[in-house]
Amino acid sequence: MHDSRADMRADFPAFRPRAPWWGGDLQTLRNTALRKLGTRFDFPGERLVLDAGDGSGDRLMALFNEGKSGQPLVVLIHGLTGCEGSSYMVNTARHLTGLGYPVMRLNMRGAGPSADCCGQRYHAGRGQDIAAALAALDPVMLGCGVMLAGYSLGGSILLNFLAHHADTFPVRAAVTVSAPIDLAECSRRILGFRNFIYHRYLIDRMKNDWAGAALGERQRTALVEVRTIWEFDDRLVAPANGFGTADNYYTECSGARVLPGLKIPTLMIHAANDPWIPAKSYRAVDWDSNAKLTPLLASGG
């Protein structure tokens, strides 16, 4: 048990839920519910096509919104089964653009509009794809530096980028929002009975995201047969990316293992009542061992 760093609250106002979104489940479901009720989450931008840079021929799609001169570029990375059109991506891009920041919403390999341009698919440790996207940009776009924000699994991808690739770019700061820093613990949590509906929703969307990937016969069979996220990771994600098993994948790509060595100022936000990602994985971190990290564990949100 570690905690510390001022009770993990930093110097931020307390979270106050707005009616009727009380509790972790309603706060998790809010944007999905609003979309089903007809709320539109649209924010047009300039389409960017960025080469993945690994010889695969895969291309990453992004949306760019211009800001005022002299401001750093902000790159947003979506979560599991998300994309540029996810409500949190749209809302953040609109807000930051209104403040004058240029914003790029990056679709990870195989996500959203990138699906038709990629044979491979993203995973929690694929920080090199963020590096490839930045390397493919006009250098002028990075002239004032870059800040990055990753949501959920996108936060895990971002942490791996910061650990292994950030030195190549003028990264000024980073933010993660509810990143699953202990992948094995998150996998166990989502398999719990209370998360049955969430799990069914996620596994169906994950299968749909992988349906257009370049898969062999054995992988196609696995895509039909898997029933849990752990099986999905064990039979599809891990073998396709050289990890072998889900357990190895979780060990190699969990963000917690890279936190002690991060050199970029990074704010890590999480809600203690999140139904998917255990708060105990954040409480287990020795935050005082790295002054570059600022944890914010809110009671809800």
What do these predicted ranges mean?
Residues 288-301:
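Catalytic histidine neighborhood in serine/cysteine hydrolases
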Residues 24-67:
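N-terminal cap/lid segment of alpha/beta-hydrolase-fold proteins
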Residues 95, 109-147:
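Catalytic nucleophile-loop/oxyanion-hole region of alpha/beta-hydrolase
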Residues 139, 143, 147-241, 247:
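Alpha/beta-hydrolase-fold enzymes
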Residues 82-85, 93-117:
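Conserved alpha/beta-hydrolase
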Residues 262, 268-270, 274:
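Short beta-strand/loop motif that positions the catalytic acidic residue
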Residues 71-79:
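Short beta-strand element of the alpha/beta-hydrolase
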